[in-house]
Amino acid sequence: MAKVIKFPIQTPEKFGFKPVRRRKTTSDKKPGQLNLFTGGKLVKLNQLSSFEEALLMDEQGDAKAKGLYQKAIQEGDAIADAYCNLGIIESEAKNFGKAIDCFTLSLKEEPRHFESHYNLANLYAEIGNFPLAKVHYETSIEIEPEFPNSHFNLGLTLAMNKEIENAILSLMNYRKRATAEEKCHADELISTLTRTITT
């Protein structure tokens, strides 16, 4: 008679949110149109924009960052980035509805905003909405295919959604992009998932 041995299942940690750490450049240029005034440049001396100030406060853990991100949005300063980072603040405060609203407003402003798709996927996975998490992880991979955490988290989400074969494939994609130390963790997960298929 065969004996079934249960292996202890370790819940792998998901990677956290990915805040926007720099101001993205926006181009007002029209395709095929030459700029006649390339030499002129407005230089602000020792003055940060509202978004840059919010980012600085946020990195220091200052609660004023939330208000400064809102100010940046009102001023039209890095709107998608500000909404994204505001979504992280709301998510960390467990205001999931507000966080989802912030991330989707960021995507309304910039539909291919990588960090918003990735963070929205993390949030959906955290609250247990795996089908929506899957969609946003897949979108973040389409936008930035070399970001390893998207592949790892997609693998975890697929495993939670009982899509084991696809989870293994996603973890193998993560493994290709991971450091040597991170590969060991991925190998353990792949091995565990493979055993669930073969038994």
List PLM regions with ranges.
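Structural marker of alpha-solenoid helical repeat scaffolds
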Residues: 75, 109, 143, 177-178
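TPR/TPR-like alpha-solenoid helical repeat scaffolds
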Residues: 156-160, 180-199
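Alpha-helical segment of the N-proximal tetratricopeptide repeat
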Residues: 40-81, 85-92
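Long, contiguous interaction/recruitment modules in multidomain scaffold/adaptor proteins
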Residues: 1-49
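Helix-start (N-cap) detector for alpha-helical repeat units in TPR-like alpha-solenoids
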Residues: 47, 80-81, 114-115, 148-149, ...
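Structural signature of tandem alpha-helical TPR/SEL1-like repeats
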Residues: 58-71, 92-105, 126-139, 161-173, ...
